[in-house]
Amino acid sequence: IMIVSYQTGMEFLQDNQAYLQTNPYLSTFFTLDAPLLKQADKINYALRCEQGDKRLLALKIEPYNLLLFGEEACAPELLRFLFDGGYEIKNYLCASELGYVLMQKMQSYGRCYEEALAMDFMEARSITEPSAPEVETAREDDLDEIFDCAQRFVSDCGLLDKPEKEPFRKILDSFRIIRADGKIVSMARIAPATQDDLRLVLVYTRNEYRGKGYARKVVNSAKNEILTSGKRATLNVDRKNPVSYHLYLSLGFERMFSQGEFRRVE
């Protein structure tokens, strides 16, 4: 059994790049967050736990969740190292199966966790229906409306993020929208992800316009645009949201894996 502790995030990435690439979708956050770790301590850290040919990676950078990637067999050893060393844990994000094992093992340390956010990662590789001509790209003067919808989306999903308006200005051209009655009624953002995919995020339809097929048009048109550019279309869907889930399945999205955000319960 061996635990490797890294001083910087770049060192961690270089050493574990090949392993992270075994599931590039699940490891996206590692690639995004790791460069932010300049000097490891007990609050911000990057670790690898090895047991025979099994391994488990851990990366924690404030203010983000502790990220975990790898095999459940290493969970007890990693936890022992973290608790013995006085490392901060807080909330964590990982594949659901691994998350459940950690949740169970944490109980012996007197810590209770729950899967507060349960997401399925889905992918589409083929066009299933034509794009809708009324779907358009957001303009500069749509900033207020898009920000308003984004805030509603965040509170609907029970996310802890507090979005800021200014950053939205730079990414307006990545939003696809439908208007009705003089306002934006449904939207989705095409966001950069890995080399192979573009991700649909912030998929939102105003309450009073739901069930009228607007989301389907926006999502399908954005999906087609992604596929036409030569990439795969991916998204995360909340497992507690059967309506969205059904919509994505009907547009040819397939579930690849489940991941969860596990929050501490006092």
How would you label these PLM feature ranges?
Residues 1-28, 124-160:
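Short amphipathic alpha-helix that is part of the acyltransferase structural core
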Residues 73-80, 205, 211-227, 245-250:
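Conserved acetyl-CoA-binding loop-helix of GNAT-fold acetyltransferases
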Residues 87-95, 226-237:
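Conserved GNAT acetyl-CoA-binding A-motif
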